[in-house]
Amino acid sequence: DAELLETLMEEQGYFASERIDYELMNLDDAPRAEIQGASPAGLTLRSHMQEDEEYLFALQSAYEQEEVLPGNASFNAAACRLNLRQILAREQILVAELDGQVVGKINTSAESFTRYQIGGVYVRPDCRGLGIGAKMTAVFSQNLLAQGRGLTLFVKKRNTAACRVYRKAGFSVLADYRITYY
């Protein structure tokens, strides 16, 4: 249990600088119909194209700074670009365009014999609340499930909007997970 380990660490003089709680979620059946509802006019979901790299880099940069890096870490643009190129080369990715502008992305971040892990879900802040994240999640999940594997993802508990989207899609919580930074 994370709290027990943290207590033992504190007794040894090590104090956490940050604790981030996650939910480990799974989906093994088609996304629920209600999440596949209306999407904003002008929304297109598509595979990535080579000319998307700069737009996707902007999204990946924002995603890493907002969702990945702990509070005391500094952003490394070169590492982010390398990470994005690896995603584009190795993972499945879906791009969201709104009125011709790239505004969101969702990708796999790992795979096993039986599961895909979803990660890198990000919608530009000025486009949130329009149903883009929900639509990306529904379409991407449906495409991955059609390949015969279940889905897994980690979501920060404090990201209540994302938690709500995933639950609405049919993802269920398998376990709690914590990362503690010292």
Feature roles, as predicted:
Residues G120-P125, G129-L145, R164-K168:
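Conserved acetyl-CoA-binding loop-helix of GNAT-fold acetyltransferases
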Residues E64-L82:
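Conserved GNAT-fold acetyl-CoA-binding loop/helix
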Residues D1-P40, T180:
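Acyl-donor-binding surface of acyltransferase catalytic domains
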Residues L8-E10, Y166, F171:
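Conserved active-site tyrosine of GNAT-family acetyltransferases
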Residues R81, R90-I106:
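Conserved beta-hairpin
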Residues A110-I118, R128:
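A conserved beta-turn-beta hairpin within the catalytic core of GNAT-like acetyltransferases
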Residues D1-L4, T152-K168, I179-Y182:
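Conserved beta-strand-loop-alpha-helix junction that forms the acyl-donor binding cleft
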Residues T44-L56:
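A short beta-loop-alpha structural element at the N-terminal edge
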